[in-house]
Swiss-Prot record:
One of its GO terms (cellular component) is cytoplasm. HAMAP family: Arg_tRNA_synth. Gene3D superfamilies: Arginyl tRNA synthetase N-terminal domain, HUPs, Isoleucyl-tRNA Synthetase, Domain 1. One of its GO terms (molecular function) is arginine-tRNA ligase activity. Pfam families: Arg_tRNA_synt_N, DALR_1, tRNA-synt_1d. Its EC number is 6.1.1.19. It comes from Legionella pneumophila (strain Paris). NCBIfam families: argS. Transmembrane segments: none annotated. It catalyses: tRNA(Arg) + L-arginine + ATP = L-arginyl-tRNA(Arg) + AMP + diphosphate. GO terms for biological process: arginyl-tRNA aminoacylation. This is Arginine--tRNA ligase.
Amino acid sequence: MRSMKAIIEYLLKQALINLQQSGEMPIDLEVEIKVENAKDPSHGDYATNLALVLAKPCRQAPKVLAERLVAVIPADPSVEKIEIAGAGFINFFMRSTARSLIISEILNKGKEFGRGNLGQSQKVLIEFVSANPTGPLHVGHGRGAAFGATLGNVLKAAGYDVTLEYYVNDAGRQMNILAVSVWLRYLELAGEPIVFPTNGYKGQYVYEIAQEMWSEQGNQFVHPWISVVENLPADEPEGGDKETYIDAIIARAQSLLGKDGFANFHQHALKTVLDDIKDDLQAFGVRFDSWFSEQSLFEDGSIEKGIQALKDRGHTYEREGALWFRATDFGDEKDRVLVRANGQTTYFASDVAYHWNKYDRGFDRVIDIFGADHHGYVTRIKTAVKALGHDESALDVILVQFAILYRGGDRVQMSTRSGSFVTLRELREEVGNDAARYFYVARKPEQHMDFDLDLAKSESSDNPVYYIQYAHARICSVLRQLKERGLKWDKDMGLKNLDLLEQQHETTLISLIARYPEVIQSAAASCEPHQLAYYLRELANGLHSYYNAIQLLCEQEQLRCARLCLLESVRQVLNNGLAILGVSAPESM
């Protein structure tokens, strides 16, 4: 069954064709038909500004054009009347019978209601979170996790074939810093008088990993502290450069431990942290289809293949012993190094290889979800994709602002290396998964977010997730009361008497639940899950108003059964929408 908005869009399209065929409108005119939900019930159910959009290219007054459009709109049993308002807006009033049909559809489809075929099984890869496996996820990562998972659910509901992927940065410098941090704590456990580097990872988890290494490996990797720091440059507290110092101490560790010894610390730290990240995300309801290793790009030759693909297309050149990508040819501010003069590939080369790999796996569309601090990567990634021969429109890069946590009115600073951060796990334990999942997606991803812990934990109408869940629980409570009072709910009787639902609260609710498929399609088309979060709050508000104003379990059986059909439809839509957000739908609260 087509949505009411889809019906109106079709009718308007036919009206345009009629005007073009009659010569009253240019035959080559193309326009996007936009139909919006009417904000004021007195203006109908839906409205369009099509006449205002077409006025200039058609050289006609908007109101005159609106009259011509309305005159040739085909008749449809779903539409009661059409009115022209203001400067040329066209308002549609739907028949109550058409609105009521949505209740029957919801009850028949259940959990499948709202699912569509916008995506037509197009293969989409969403890469998100992808935090360096150098420590636990913090509350900033949590927003990207919730957003990516919810976007995946929205796209699946809209008919896309979605794969969720976490890119594991297991081949970079940060992993070496973690490995050497663990080794230094290991030396500390052995009694060595270490001075921990300014740029090392300082969290409690580093001690715990070091303790595991000490318990499993004994003292076989112990070296005197003097041999570790001998002839090294100064660290920052001694007037040196912390980056130079940490690189030097990594090189010393690799020399003293040997390739296999250093790899032992590297792999143990990686596995421990990555397992913790996986457990954390699993508990948060975020499940990935693929965990893609950066190291695999080196092992399977993807790095070389990606670079070669750019070479073959003539998009590289050599300068001062390094291999460069002609990024400026594709709109970047400067060219980018792929291979340094010493033969080492750059992070950018890994990015090129990874995206070459994504398209090589047959995905039609790629969505990268980055933290806002990665804004500088957007242009260079897009230029690489374009240079590799792919349509730039097949890549979407969405930047998610990190959430800022406030406790007692104070902002909590977060830094992985300093070890002073609030983890996602701690946040979940304090406010619960449901509040975290909802709050994280309740705003546009590019908007800054202040996470109010007090609000997230409150049991009031000010807390949106509580308000929505309470609406679901209230409906379940009514159904329980039905049994307790020995009353019947005959669904067939209710469906035959939906015309009895004439109260303003009832017609409002019917209009709201009819919008659900449109919300899913719109959220998917724009990659904006917050639209669903807003909608569910609006639906919950409609339910609470109805609950407070109307005697739901009335004595008149036909009306009672009709109202229960409406209530069950609202409950189903709330359930379906909350499931997409990754939020539970409790039956009692």
